[in-house]
UniProtKB/Swiss-Prot annotation:
Protein name per the record: Argininosuccinate lyase 1
Organism: Pseudomonas fluorescens (strain Pf0-1)
Reactions that this protein is recorded to catalyse: 2-(N(omega)-L-arginino)succinate = fumarate + L-arginine
GO CC terms, sorted: cytosol
Main EC class the enzyme belongs to: lyase
A biological-process GO annotation: L-arginine biosynthetic process
Pfam families hit by this protein: ASL_C2, Lyase_1
Disulfide bonds: none
């Protein structure tokens, strides 16, 4: 083959590309991770060529066997792209023609790199959103397992990072699990929207050969085919949406990680990290650092950067395909890899932590966290809440002045603040009473928390089933 036609696009050129163009144009090494997905699309396209009459049954069988052989050799590390392989598609066509001769060159008919690359990334993402979901479910399971052990472990709840009201520790852990439940729901919703094959769009106008791509779409596990050939090759909103979901997941992980940095500090002393999930200092022998939490917190910014990078690339691109779109894979591969590093480490840290229940309880009433109980006690006895709030504020001021806790206020002090404050109010000023009072749906009362755990387990089981019931291509 001549120098001008080594590449898939070289036929109309009198000379090959400059070294600078070749270096810029060649896809990064990491993009060749899409090879198995390109092979899956190629096998489906071979069937479409047979249906179109360009391949007979034996040729199709030979083609698919060769593609399977390339896949096996690639997975085993027996073959690798060369510097002359401009991209995944060139790499596979070179190997196919080396093994099959002229027959290998037939596979290109009826398709373009434009619909191929769009298909490769969709297949990669549909596979990996399930892998990611499994890891998120493992982290959620660790949170739920810890929550089950601490349904009655009372701790302070916070607003503005100030102690606010007593809650059970399980309730706090489950709040993180609930946010991640939505992360997986977003992956599931995304997958339903993305389950459309772009094959058959060819360069942008549609294929004059592969005119019935519904069967190949079904073989690849898609629910259907993209409605518009231009949209199929030009749009990457599904990629940006995935990167948003990855960013939101990273942010939710980062919030949990931030709390572990606080909880494991000497100032909080809420949790002790297992030695296998903490590090030390090169100069301070006493240190036990929450590096997993800190690294997870830091990588959230990386995930957000991948999203904003792609959004900036997509801005103002005219229809249809533009080479700018080749940047779509950078953020995807990095975000997937980042999350697959962070999630197992976070799950292990959560699963192995030791909770200091006594310290949680000691801190629970500090900062007058039971003050709302006084206001509620007055309100249910007919005092307008505006007045109840003011009366309770005056009681807090008096207790601060006399260095008392709320439940230590004498009947005389209570009456001095307001005659409607009788000694009976002190029955409400226990941690157990405050917790038990929050017995409405979604509240922190232990029975409500147990019911929440049951519902959450049911939801997690359904999400786990979704990860397993996939008919598309998976590595």
């Amino acid at each position: 083959m001549s120098q001008t036609t080594d590449r898939l696009w070289g036929a109309r050129f009198k000379s090959g590309p400059s070294a600078a163009l070749a270096a810029l144009s060649r896809c990064p090494e990491r993009y060749f991770r899409l090879t198995p997905y390109d092979l899956a699309g190629s096998k489906a396209h071979a069937g479409e060529l047979q249906r179109a009459g360009l391949l007979d049954e034996q040729e199709t069988r030979t083609m698919i066997e060769a593609l399977d052989g390339i896949g096996a050799d690639f997975a085993a590390g027996r073959i690798a792209p060369t510097l002359d392989d401009e991209d995944v598609h060139t790499f596979i066509e070179r190997l196919l023609t080396e093994r099959l001769g002229a027959l290998g060159g037939k596979l290109r008919a009826g398709r373009s790199r434009n619909d191929q690359t769009a298909n490769d990334l969709r297949l990669f993402l549909r596979d990996h959103v399930r892998t990611l979901a499994v890891e998120v479910l493992a982290l959620q399971t660790a949170l739920v397992d810890q929550a089950e052990q601490h349904v009655e472990s009372i701790c302070p709840g916070f607003t503005h990072l100030q102690q606010a009201q007593p809650i059970v520790f399980a309730h706090h852990l489950l709040a993180h699990a609930q946010s991640m439940l939505r992360d997986v729901q977003r992956l599931m919703d995304w997958d339903a929207r993305t389950s459309l094959s772009p094959l058959g769009a060819a360069a942008m106008a549609g294929s004059a050969i592969a005119r019935q791509p519904q069967q190949s779409a079904k073989e690849m596990g898609y629910a259907g085919v993209c409605e518009n050939s231009i949209d199929a090759v030009a749009s990457r909103d599904h990629v940006a949406e995935f990167l948003f979901i990855a960013s939101m997941l990273g942010i939710n992980i980062s919030r949990l990680a931030e709390e572990f940095c606080l909880w494991s500090s000497r100032q909080f002393r809420w949790v002790d990290l297992d030695d296998a999930y903490a590090t030390g200092s090169s100069i301070m022998p006493q240190k036990k650092n929450p590096d997993i939490a800190e690294l997870a917190r830091g990588k959230a910014g990386r995930l957000i950067g991948n999203l904003t990078g792609l959004l900036s690339t997509l801005k103002s691109l005219p229809l249809s395909y533009n080479r700018d779109l080749s940047e779509d894979k950078n953020g995807v591969l990095d975000s997937v890899d980042t999350l697959l590093l962070v999630l197992p480490a976070m799950a292990g840290m959560v699963a192995t932590m030791t909770v200091n229940v006594e310290e949680l309880r000691r801190q629970a009433p500090l900062g007058f966290t039971l003050a709302t109980e006084v206001a509620d006690w007055l309100a249910v006895r007919g005092v307008p809440f505006k007045e109840a709030h003011e009366i309770t504020g005056a009681l807090v001021q008096a207790c601060e002045k006399h260095d008392l806790e709320l439940w230590e206020a004498s009947p005389a002090l209570l009456a001095e603040i307001d005659p409607r404050l009788t000694a009976d109010v002190r029955d409400s000023l226990t941690l157990e009473a405050a917790i038990a009072a929050r017995s409405g749906w979604g509240g922190t009362a232990p029975q409500q928390v147990r019911e929440q755990i049951g519902r959450l387990k049911t939801a997690l089981a359904a999400q786990q089933q979704w990860t397993e019931n996939y008919q598309g291509f998976r590595l």
